[in-house]
């Protein structure tokens, strides 16, 4: 029997091609790390099923984006993949999962950053708010869609956030303090 998230992935990624492989491999790595981090926080009573589902769907919108290096041949700029994914998941009746999509880019993106960098996004804050949203966003920073077989160090993950501005680095450092150094999870290749 298919999981709910698998049916959504199958709908938007029906072909067994490189893009689907990239999405599934990256998302499984993010889900595994997010779940490992969540299990460190038993007192928080986190929704582990939701964490797995939302982590598996957080990048669903890449199919609509133009990023040939990862086999995406859509029309939207890559920075908009979170918003695109959120739109897709809201259409599927998954508003809680949609919030993860639109809030995971960088360490979240502020309205101020959107304005100052002239990003093609609505002028509003896209910041992870719930603990589940934060854990998935944090876990995502340790995996790239171009190097599926590697997990980044904290230093490498932080460096990759520099393009989003100092406020994202500050949020990321707070997550390192709150959630700790991530355990090594074997990337799902």
PLM regions: where:
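Alpha-helix initiation and N-capping motif
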Residues: 1-6, 94, 154, 169
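Acidic/His-rich, divalent-metal-binding segments that scaffold phosphate/diphosphate chemistry
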Residues: 1-78
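A general alpha-helix detector
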Residues: 8-12, 33, 84-85, 138, ...
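Charge-dense, low-complexity intrinsically disordered segments
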Residues: 17, 21-24, 129, 163-166
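Generic alpha-helical structural element
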Residues: 19, 90, 146, 161-164
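Generic structural signal for well-ordered, non-transmembrane alpha-helical segments
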Residues: 28, 32, 95, 177-180
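Divalent metal-dependent catalytic cores for phosphoryl transfer on phosphate-bearing substrates
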Residues: 43-150, 154
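Charged phosphate-binding loop/patch that engages nucleotide di/tri-phosphates or the phosphate backbone
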Residues: 161-189
């Amino acid at each position: 029997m298919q999981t709910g998230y698998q049916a959504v992935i199958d709908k938007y990624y029906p072909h067994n091609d490189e893009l689907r492989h990239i999405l599934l491999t990256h998302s499984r790595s993010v889900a595994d790390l997010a779940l490992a981090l969540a299990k460190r926080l038993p007192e928080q009573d986190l929704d582990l099923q939701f964490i797995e589902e939302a982590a598996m769907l957080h990048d669903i919108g890449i199919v609509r984006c133009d990023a040939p290096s990862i086999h995406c041949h859509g029309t939207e700029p890559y920075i908009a993949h979170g918003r695109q994914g959120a739109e897709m998941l809201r259409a599927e009746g998954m508003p809680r999962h949609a919030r993860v999509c639109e809030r995971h880019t960088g360490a979240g993106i502020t309205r101020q950053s959107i304005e100052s960098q002239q990003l093609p996004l609505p002028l509003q804050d896209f910041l992870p708010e719930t603990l589940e949203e934060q854990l998935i966003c944090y876990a995502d920073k340790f995996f790239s869609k171009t190097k599926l077989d590697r997990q980044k160090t904290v230093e490498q993950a932080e460096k990759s956030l520099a393009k989003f501005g100092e406020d994202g680095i500050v949020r990321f450092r707070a997550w390192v303090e709150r959630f700790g150094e991530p355990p090594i999870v074997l990337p799902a290749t």
